[in-house]
């Protein structure tokens, strides 16, 4: 059965650490499924007319997380969408009520690879500390058990292209979504 038909329009939520490739992979996945693509961080910046960094600095992480939940609730009302979420979206239990209405895919990336990807990134407010490896390990420890609640886990290593990761996701979706049996199949 074709993956699109199997999905029946449900949303796909990409979760994982910052730098895991949620936005890059999400855009390609949405294209392949003929879905819309949303990035919750970009939506937050549009709604607030501030950068994520500025929200953290001027209003704090708690306010940011509240805005993030509001944005997630609004995008969850859409269908046929791939949604790249912020790395900490899993921390709020209310967010899980929205995520569970779709297919949750965790992009699992090693700390070593994340460090390589994020070493020169100055836009991430949670990475302002001097020891990037320690900060990433701490965030990973806080979130790993929550990420593990995903319907599907895709392990990403350095040698993979975004296209190959999307192909793996598309091949794996039928293993976690079972086709609905239609009543007329038994007539």
From Swiss-Prot:
Biological processes, Gene Ontology terms: amino acid biosynthetic process; aromatic amino acid family biosynthetic process; chorismate biosynthetic process
Entry binding sites for ATP: 19-24, 124, 160
Major subcellular site: cytoplasm
Domain of life: Bacteria
Binding site for Mg(2+): 23
This protein's GO CC annotations: cytosol
Keywords tagged on the record: Amino-acid biosynthesis, Aromatic amino acid biosynthesis, ATP-binding, Cytoplasm, Kinase, Magnesium, Metal-binding, Nucleotide-binding, Transferase
Location in or out of the cell: Cytoplasm
GO MF: ATP binding; magnesium ion binding; shikimate kinase activity
PROSITE patterns tied to this protein: SHIKIMATE_KINASE
Covalent S-S links between cysteines: none
Enzyme class: transferase
EC number of the protein: 2.7.1.71
Known role: Catalyzes the specific phosphorylation of the 3-hydroxyl group of shikimic acid using ATP as a cosubstrate.
Family designation: Belongs to the shikimate kinase family.
The protein's name: Shikimate kinase
Organism: Rippkaea orientalis (strain PCC 8801 / RF-1)
Gene designation per UniProt: aroK
